[in-house]
């Protein structure tokens, strides 16, 4: 195993904070573009469906906040602080989520996901000590540090952790079927 280096979250790729189109305009909603919010299921690795969707009109209001597939999204406010998912297609998030469009030449997407899960747990723990609603803004989020090995080691670690996640998902499905 090689040396692990400290890397700021902002160095992992482009950081994008989500935006919400005007909710008073109903034509902004109900289209085919996923609109991820912390109330969506962020307990899974990949977000495949969102409760809300945007139309092309809604997208035009927040066009500079569109995320490509394989972006790592981190909820950065309130009781949902620290939840993490990866997008599976172009997605918009609301302003409660900071996302990383990972620099794939230097970092493995799945490794970044797992690193953000660890950071998310730390953020959530810290938030429990505050009486105010905890918020992690884009600049604070970008300045947090994580440890990263070489890209090759990141890929190896991600393969092992992903296999474990798949096994856990299979076991949950089996348990759900047995309980039914």
Where are these predicted regions, by residue range?
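Short, positively charged
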Residues: 110-140
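Short coil/turn segments at secondary-structure boundaries
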Residues: 22-30, 127-129
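Short clusters of hydrophobic/aromatic residues that line enzyme substrate/ligand-binding pockets
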Residues: 47, 54, 84-86, 123, ...
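A generic secondary-structure signal marking the coil-to-beta-strand transition
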Residues: 5, 32-34
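Non-catalytic DNA-recognition/assembly elements of restriction-modification systems
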Residues: 1-20, 143-158, 162-180
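A short glycine-rich beta-alpha junction/loop motif
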Residues: 2, 77, 91-98, 129-158
């Amino acid at each position: 195993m090689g040396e692990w280096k400290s890397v700021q979250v902002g160095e992992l790729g482009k950081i994008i904070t989500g935006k919400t189109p005007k909710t008073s305009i109903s034509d902004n909603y109900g289209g085919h573009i996923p609109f991820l919010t912390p109330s969506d299921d962020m307990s899974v690795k990949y977000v495949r469906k969102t409760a809300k969707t945007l139309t092309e009109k809604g997208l035009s209001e927040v066009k500079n906040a569109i995320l490509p597939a394989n972006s790592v999204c981190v909820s950065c406010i309130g009781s949902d602080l620290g939840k993490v998912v990866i997008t599976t297609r172009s997605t918009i998030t609301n302003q409660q989520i900071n996302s990383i469009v990972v620099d794939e030449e230097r970092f493995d997407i799945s490794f970044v996901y797992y690193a953000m899960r660890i950071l998310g747990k730390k953020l959530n723990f810290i938030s429990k000590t505050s009486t105010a609603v905890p918020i992690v803004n884009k600049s604070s989020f970008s300045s947090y540090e994580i440890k990263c090995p070489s890209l090759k080691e990141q890929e190896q670690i991600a393969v092992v952790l992903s296999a474990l996640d798949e096994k856990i998902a299979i076991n949950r499905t089996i348990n759900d079927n047995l309980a039914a």
